[in-house]
Amino acid sequence: MTTISDLPYDLLPEILSRLPTKSIPKLKTTCKKWYALFKDPKFVEKKLGKAARETVFLMNHEVNSISVDIHGIPKGYSVSMDFTGTLTIPEGSDLEIFRIHHCNGLFLCATMNCRLVVWNPCTGQITWIIPRTRYDSDDIYALGCGDDKSSSLHSYKILRCCDDNQKKPVSEIYDFSSSSWRVLDGVTANCFIECNGVALKESAYWYASDKRETPKGKFILRFDFATERFARLCLPLNFQRDRDNKSVVVSVVGEEKLALLQQFDHRVHGLKYSKIKIWVTDTKIGEGKDLSWSNILVEELADDNLPSVTSFLLDEEKKVAVCSDAVCSDTDTEDEDRRRIYIVGEGVDEFVYDEVSTETSHNWPFLVSYVPNLVHIEKDAPIVEV
């Protein structure tokens, strides 16, 4: 009797490419032909275009898979959110994840005990990254790729911005093709990076400001993983540079655009409100040397509704943002530690998740939208204490 593993090899890519991406790793041990196919860069690249987008929420050092549904915009809307599972790093149940950096379905995770691991949540594969010098919780990281949507891990790189032993800023690159770090001579950000970065195409982006602390010295900072250089890009023309911002956050819209959220306080007839503005880049990233922006959303909220946005995901068509926020516990005011998810947009203003904790958490909640990827991660590097 003929079984599926006996099918001609040239038929397998078409058949298996129709399966959900997350189910494929469970099948790779079926036979040698299948295992070889799942490591084939052409097959991996084909699956990248078919996998459904997923959302995860970093909260209390755990990565949770969530589903957010929004219907009936702008009138008669209904919103709901479900936790669909917890993603666990293999052999890492005791790990406390401090930050997540995402690129093409791969996660770079910094832990509370200053370790660094690259993780493919789709395949479950990981590799620990040995430091050149001891990691610090203040280090800035980004995961990127010199080739857009590359199907080979060897094309990926890690950027680390840190201080050397003399407290001077240093930028260094971990190159997966050589499994080693190297210092970028004369290349530093030379600014304050004020939010978690995002990866798009071959670059990483942050909201940043000059160390001179002047209103004009605020910009989008880009690091190009192909050229390994920083560049400063413009903010929206009507960005409130002179405001005392509660938060400014960068996000990605699909696979082609950046979004920027600014949250600040203002008063109307003596009452304090929190205003949110969201912009989206007009053109696809990479089509111009600088950025041009369009303001697509302005919302005014009661001040206690959204204390401090830590991340957001934008539905540009519906003009709705899914935001995470945090309230740190305060013994003086008896405020409790809270982690929340909030929907804001045209005709929408609602919490879908609100967790209260008596214990203070030291990591900000963070939302990530990603497409599962079959990029193969080689065996773990040994863990070395530095």
Curated annotation (Swiss-Prot):
Positions of Kelch repeats: 155-203, 340-386
The record's annotation in Pfam families points to: F-box, FBA_1
Per its UniProt record, what SUPFAM superfamilies does this chain match? F-box domain, PH domain-like
Q: Which superkingdom, per the lineage?
A: Eukaryota
Q: Tell me the Gene3D superfamilies matching this sequence.
A: 1.20.1280.50
Question: Which InterPro entries does the record associate with it?
Answer: F-box-assoc_dom_typ1 (IPR006527), F-box-assoc_interact_dom (IPR017451), F-box-like_dom_sf (IPR036047), F-box_dom (IPR001810), SCF_F-box_component (IPR050796)
Record bears the keyword Repeat: yes
Q: Where is the F-box domain?
A: 1-48
Transmembrane regions? none
| Keywords recorded for this protein, A-Z | Kelch repeat, Repeat
> Record's PANTHER family?
BNACNNG10540D PROTEIN (PTHR31672)
Under NCBIfam families, the record lists:
F_box_assoc_1
* Name this polypeptide is given: Putative F-box/kelch-repeat protein At3g17280
User: Which organism's genome codes for this protein?
Assistant: Arabidopsis thaliana
